[in-house]
Amino acid sequence: KESAAAKFZRZHMBSSTSSASSSBYCBZMMKSRNLTQDRCKPVBTFVHZSLABVZAVCSZKBVACKBGZTBCYZSYSTMSITBCRZTGSSKYPBCAYKTTQAKKHIIVACZGBPYVPVHFBASV
């Protein structure tokens, strides 16, 4: 079974590019990362930074998660991210996404030993 840390990497990490390469980025990434297999995942964020830099956020600014849990951390610096949001015309299995490039602080939930990101909570 895929670990929570591995799932985070599959769903949110794209260290190989510094930003979204084209407007098709989200359509392609959501499909290739299996985020449209049994439904269209409505929203997803990819982070264009090294895994080490994202894992380091687990020791940065301690903040509350959206659900009120306390295991979330906000990055001290802004990171290059791409937000993928399902469009109005998107219909499974033909999932369609709007690609939005941004530089923002990320908020992740961390757990385990080693203490690593397992959930992408928000960007601010």
From Swiss-Prot:
GO BP annotations, alphabetical order: defense response to Gram-positive bacterium
Residues the record marks as carrying a glycan: N34
Keywords: Disulfide bond, Endonuclease, Glycoprotein, Hydrolase, Lyase, Nuclease, Secreted
Family affiliation: Belongs to the pancreatic ribonuclease family.
Class of the enzyme per the UniProt entry, highest EC level: lyase
Species name: Damaliscus korrigum (Topi)
Active site: H12, H119
Name of this protein: Ribonuclease pancreatic
Tissue expression profile of the protein: Pancreas.
Residue ranges the record marks as coiled coil: none
Cysteines joined through disulfide linkages: C26-C84, C40-C95, C58-C110, C65-C72
Assembly description: Monomer. Interacts with and forms tight 1:1 complexes with RNH1. Dimerization of two such complexes may occur. Interaction with RNH1 inhibits this protein.
CDD domains according to UniProt: RNase_A_canonical (cd06265)
Molecular function in Gene Ontology: lyase activity; nucleic acid binding; ribonuclease A activity
